[in-house]
């Protein structure tokens, strides 16, 4: 069955830019339908669907050098094709940017994960990819119930982190922080969750905002080359994903995640901008209240809350771009089956 759909595998066929990936459909002995739509895009349809069937987008490779999720996704697809991995949910697997992955670069012209807002952008390789991904989402979510829509966008962090894995929950106009989504996070042993406080330009935000999908950006370890990822540290995530796809009850115990709210976004305003810490500072490094950690022009950058921590710091961003997120730990609860905080 594998040879009839892929010459090597979903991942490595997608990366072989010298050979076309022809759209085709096959069915496994278990009755699962696999539709290869285009390079890097595979739809998987279970043999039977019902009112509880999820419509899940599982994407990776938005940044070309974040390869751990690609290796995991490739294994899931291999096991679906062979029949080893049961399928109970309709899935759209996406490997977004093969050209960048082949070069082992984050992007070619501009950051793909900043192109999903509704603002005009300069034409580029990445803008064409973003436009194509928007079309794929529209087609995949067409004629589906909002409650059935999920989107897990899988990444790796550029830098080390106090939390090896963490999730970013987008802020959308729809209720997209369901109890079932957060239960999956705990089952996957994702160490922390960041609750965004404003709209953004990411792929997962786009799904949440435009399709009311239960959406997350998941940061899984640190950037490495294909074959050099520490996948054993993502075992619980691997198992939780397999249980999610098959709708099986997990056999391993969940683990509580540390919850953070985004307290503010630091946007670079001046040429004279810098942080006081080194480039290898870890995500979620915390500061004391009032501690100065950088400057923007004449203005010092300081912690406004005790224990306020920094995530995704980048001193090299252009003026007007996000230079960091600041986060604080928060207690959460559920209202109407949605995660909230005071």
From Swiss-Prot:
Record GO terms (molecular function): hydrolase activity, acting on carbon-nitrogen (but not peptide) bonds, in linear amides; hydrolase activity, acting on ester bonds; succinylglutamate desuccinylase activity; zinc ion binding
Any one GO BP annotation for this protein: arginine catabolic process to succinate
Swiss-Prot/TrEMBL cofactor(s): Zn(2+)
Cofactor annotation remark: Binds 1 zinc ion per subunit.
Annotated metabolic or biological route of this protein: Amino-acid degradation; L-arginine degradation via AST pathway; L-glutamate and succinate from L-arginine: step 5/5
Keyword Nuclease (UniProt): no
Annotated keywords: Arginine metabolism, Hydrolase, Metal-binding, Zinc
Active site feature: 219
Residues reported in the UniProt entry to bind Zn(2+): 63, 66, 155
Listed InterPro entries: AspA/AstE_fam, AstE_AspA_cat, Aste_AspA_hybrid_dom, SuccinylGlu_desuccinylase
Catalytic activity: N-succinyl-L-glutamate + H2O = L-glutamate + succinate
Enzyme class name: hydrolase
Pfam families for this protein: AstE_AspA_cat, AstE_AspA_hybrid
Enzyme nomenclature, EC number: 3.5.1.96
UniProt-listed HAMAP family: Arg_catab_AstE (MF_00767)
Function: Transforms N(2)-succinylglutamate into succinate and glutamate.
NCBIfam families, per the entry: PRK05324.1
Family as reported in the entry's similarity comment: Belongs to the AspA/AstE family. Succinylglutamate desuccinylase subfamily.
Protein name: Succinylglutamate desuccinylase
Gene: astE
